[in-house]
């Protein structure tokens, strides 16, 4: 009887590919790792061999029971049966996050790990097209993420690496946390600014004269080629015009 795996997950089982991924993670024996999606425990087992402690979160009951049996003697692994979107990451502990995330939950999960965790490094296997969207500063997701993390591709993972085979290719990406570009006290204003900016609702943000001043100060000649740094400059002008700085 075929088991109904929640979220129609695609699993990495190829030993060579798993080892390539592990090599890219650059984990140390002192690292604490939180894994998103235990799956069948293939990656979990390898993570536990090279890190101090692995806490793996899995929502699907069948997979949780399967991996619990497989990993029950591994003292370095703690399994948690929970939705990652409901999971509370620790505030004071140092840790890294690793995970292969369901394609249709990519946006929710990446926001979760960036904005609701304190992980220094985050490694995610995502659909290739989604990775490109995280870099697109003409989209709200890209503008929000870039304030907290830098994003880079580490590995290409063709569809053939997964079972069952998905219709799209995937990539392993690394998100490295840096000092925030937008202080907490301005975050709500920034999210409002971004929502209007990406929809080109400039009149909701500036008067005509203010808009021209902001563009001039940011040295923007063409809005279609605006950079992330220029958008930050324009946001700072928005704060100044509204008496927030």
Curated annotation (Swiss-Prot):
S-adenosyl-L-methionine binds at residues 10, 12, 37, 58, 83, 100. SMART domains: rADc. Its EC number is 2.1.1.184. GO terms for biological process: response to antibiotic. It holds the Pfam family RrnaAD. It comes from the Bacteria. One of its GO terms (cellular component) is cytosol. Keywords: Antibiotic resistance, Methyltransferase, Plasmid, RNA-binding, S-adenosyl-L-methionine, Transferase. InterPro entries: KsgA/Erm, rRNA_Ade_diMease-like_C, rRNA_Ade_Mease_Trfase_CS, rRNA_Ade_methylase_Trfase_N, SAM-dependent_MTases_sf. It catalyses: adenosine(2085) in 23S rRNA + 2 S-adenosyl-L-methionine = N(6)-dimethyladenosine(2085) in 23S rRNA + 2 S-adenosyl-L-homocysteine + 2 H(+). One of its GO terms (molecular function) is 23S rRNA (adenine(2085)-N(6))-dimethyltransferase activity. This protein produces a dimethylation of the adenine residue at position 2085 in 23S rRNA, resulting in reduced affinity between ribosomes and macrolide-lincosamide-streptogramin B antibiotics. Belongs to the class I-like SAM-binding methyltransferase superfamily. rRNA adenine N(6)-methyltransferase family. NCBIfam families: Erm23S_rRNA_broad, erm_B_23S_MT. PANTHER family: DIMETHYLADENOSINE TRANSFERASE, DIMETHYLADENOSINE TRANSFERASE-RELATED. This is rRNA adenine N-6-methyltransferase.
